[in-house]
């Protein structure tokens, strides 16, 4: 049976201690034979609303901490890059390079990521027609010398795309479940359930969010039939230094993932 991809971890590396506490709580996912697990956290949040917002420890220290998670827990790592010159050093630690939604059309960044051996998760911009994500996927595949396109070509060459909501007026996002079907024509699809409930800029200098909608939207995405899920999680989301309002605590995450596995099994049985 095909494994469900699960990407989870704190939004940003706040400290090594916090990262290890979260990784310890997530290790059961890494050991689950039905899950392809990636630990996620960012070394730099380069697009925070305010210049005064916490960004993270930076590239060098952040990669050391992510490598220590890999060594201690045997987890594969996903983290995002914002500049082309980050692709090579980050790929020495990360198994997956994530292209942020705001940067999903940046050719130089996509090409630099494609030149590494890492898998690539391209987050669809909040502004982007879901069918246009195919051009970002093609930039990666063609850089890697792949002329084929479509779901199977992307899957073979380690390219995912992620849905994280679409702009709906100012300070709000909505999820159009049709986009999951459309995007899956071009690559395996990940549903970013926590960023999809974000309310950009709604907290006065930072983004707000409505985490009570995370589980319902994730269940709906599972029913559509996709390849995996992305969740940001924290020991105490209320105290998180980034994106706390849309995160799940660890108990809610575990319950949600169990439900998603059940839904995916039903979908597979009825295909």
Curated annotation (Swiss-Prot):
Task: List the SUPFAM superfamilies.
Answer: Aldolase
InterPro entries in the cross-refs? Aldolase_TIM, DAHP1/KDSA, KDO8P_synthase
One GO MF term attached to the UniProt entry: 3-deoxy-8-phosphooctulonate synthase activity
Record pathway: Carbohydrate biosynthesis; 3-deoxy-D-manno-octulosonate biosynthesis; 3-deoxy-D-manno-octulosonate from D-ribulose 5-phosphate: step 2/3; Bacterial outer membrane biogenesis; lipopolysaccharide biosynthesis
**A GO BP term, please?**
keto-3-deoxy-D-manno-octulosonic acid biosynthetic process
The protein's location, in the record's own words, is: Cytoplasm
Q: Does the keyword Cytoplasm apply?
A: yes
Entry EC number(s) = 2.5.1.55
Q: Keyword set for this entry?
A: Cytoplasm, Lipopolysaccharide biosynthesis, Transferase
Pfam families according to UniProt: DAHP_synth_1
Catalysed reactions, as listed in the record? D-arabinose 5-phosphate + phosphoenolpyruvate + H2O = 3-deoxy-alpha-D-manno-2-octulosonate-8-phosphate + phosphate
**GO cellular component: a single term:** cytoplasm
Q: Which PANTHER family match?
A: PHOSPHO-2-DEHYDRO-3-DEOXYHEPTONATE ALDOLASE (PTHR21057)
Q: Which family does the entry's similarity section mention? A: Belongs to the KdsA family.
Q: What is this protein called?
A: 2-dehydro-3-deoxyphosphooctonate aldolase
Record lineage: Bacteria, Pseudomonadati, Campylobacterota, Epsilonproteobacteria, Campylobacterales
Q: What gene, per UniProt, encodes this protein? A: kdsA
């Amino acid at each position: 049976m095909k494994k469900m991809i699960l990407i989870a971890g704190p939004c940003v590396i706040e400290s090594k201690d916090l990262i290890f506490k979260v990784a310890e709580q997530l290790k059961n996912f890494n050991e689950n034979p039905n899950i392809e697990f990636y630990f996620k956290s960012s070394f730099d949040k380069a697009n925070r609303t305010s210049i005064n917002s916490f960004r993270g420890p930076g590239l060098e220290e952040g990669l050391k901490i992510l490598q220590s998670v890999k060594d201690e827990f045997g987890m594969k790592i996903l983290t995002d890059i914002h500049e082309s010159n980050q692709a090579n050093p980050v790929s020495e630690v990360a198994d997956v390079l994530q292209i942020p939604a705001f940067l999903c059309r940046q050719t130089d960044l996509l090409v630099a990521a494609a030149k590494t051996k890492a898998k690539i998760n391209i987050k669809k911009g909040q502004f982007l027609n879901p069918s246009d994500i195919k051009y970002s996927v093609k930039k990666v595949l063609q850089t890697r010398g792949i002329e084929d396109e479509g779901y199977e070509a992307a899957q073979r060459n380690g390219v995912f795309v992620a849905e994280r909501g679409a702009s709906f007026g100012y300070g709000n996002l909505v999820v159009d479940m049709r986009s999951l079907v459309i995007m899956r024509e071009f690559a395996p699809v990940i549903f970013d359930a926590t960023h999809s409930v974000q309310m950009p800029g709604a907290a006065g200098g930072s983004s707000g969010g409505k985490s009570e909608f995370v589980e319902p939207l994730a269940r709906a995405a599972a029913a559509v039939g996709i390849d995996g899920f992305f969740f940001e999680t924290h020991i105490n989301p209320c105290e998180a230094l980034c994106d706390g309002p849309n995160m799940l605590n660890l108990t809610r995450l575990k319950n949600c993932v169990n439900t998603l596995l059940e839904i995916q099994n039903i979908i597979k049985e009825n295909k």
